[in-house]
Amino acid sequence: MSAKMLHVVMYPWFAYGHMIPFLHLSNKLAETGHKVTYILPPKALTRLQNLNLNPTQITFRTITVPRVDGLPAGAENVTDIPDITLHTHLATALDRTRPEFETIVELIKPDVIMYDVAYWVPEVAVKYGAKSVAYSVVSAASVSLSKTVVDRMTPLEKPMTEEERKKKFAQYPHLIQLYGPFGEGITMYDRLTGMLSKCDAIACRTCREIEGKYCQYLSTQYEKKVTLTGPVLPEPEVGATLEAPWSEWLSRFKLGSVLFCAFGSQFYLDKDQFQEIILGLEMTNLPFLMAVQPPKGCATIEEAYPEGFAERVKDRGVVTSQWVQQLVILAHPAVGCFVNHCAFGTMWEALLSEKQLVMIPQLGDQILNTKMLADELKVGVEVERGIGGWVSKENLCKAIKSVMDEDSEIGKDVKQSHEKWRATLSSKDLMSTYIDSFIKDLQALVE
């Protein structure tokens, strides 16, 4: 008997860092003949439709983002909301899409619904005869930590006090954010545990080679199947070329000499920290290209420059707020070092690149991803922070020099370790095996 062709609904959190990985997985499902209905806000459709590689198998359905007090007018995505404290209102808006979401599900009758932040999806799935799969596109380590802290800090029969909730753990991110509101009448912690405890199965965008022990821990704690998709990165575009201005600029410098620094499209540095970081790049005396949003309170990058900076680096340094072709830049032979925030998607791109890695994590799972790369896999270095998490120009320069100087033992060691892991992870058979196994798990779930 042939395996069932599935109809899968995708409903990710309204952030491109979630929506894009969901779409990459949709493309993999569609390649093998499965049907996908991908539900998203209208403005996101404009950005994502070109990433749909199988339009005959993947259908986009837009959903209206309700107006919520405190949410900026027209906001449909975290990118529309620079102030991270207002993201709770977007979560409220997501929850208020439930009636329209239910109408869509009732109409199309899917076999499986994959979701993340919309913790109530399992209730909808049960109502209409579908299976629910919580898909985590952040590191399994960070999800495991939230479970560990709550279950192990205090006796199970004793409620946590506010002081216990605020307690910090050495070398781990401050977890008080888990207990703050994330939506109307719900905390981030309750949303996260609800997402994972109510579903029929958990899927993680990772692989056993990197996070096997964390995935096994999640399976044990939630007493359910945890299936892995692998990192699900897009295939490199055949013949993809770098836009002319960047290609021409990079080609001016010798092989492996350029620093490429990127912090993602959803994070905004404080002005003084932005200035310190670009001064640190300048201090290395190496050419550099930095892609970053304008700092908080600034309309443009240029208005935040320290005095004299633009003139001093005009021949070897560029800072831009434009979207850049990150993967294509990472493949350019002039680039030798990737300075990044270690968001989960960026982490995989960094691991699969041939560049030296320097990490400056900013928040959430980025801190744990960095610990994994720097301390466990030993494929890069983390920039040392000062009081209050401050990244000084001296410490940034020191970290970069430690991996870029030809005679540096640290640089040699992380390069050797990185090459080993890149060889393992770049195996096409390895990644296709994960997708094949994931699809079989979905088919078994609906039988």
UniProtKB/Swiss-Prot annotation:
The keyword Transferase applies. The keyword Transferase applies. It is an enzyme of class 2 (transferase). Coiled coil: none annotated. This is UDP-glucosyl transferase 79T1. Pathway: Secondary metabolite biosynthesis; terpenoid biosynthesis. UDP binds at S265, W323, V324, H341, T346, E349.
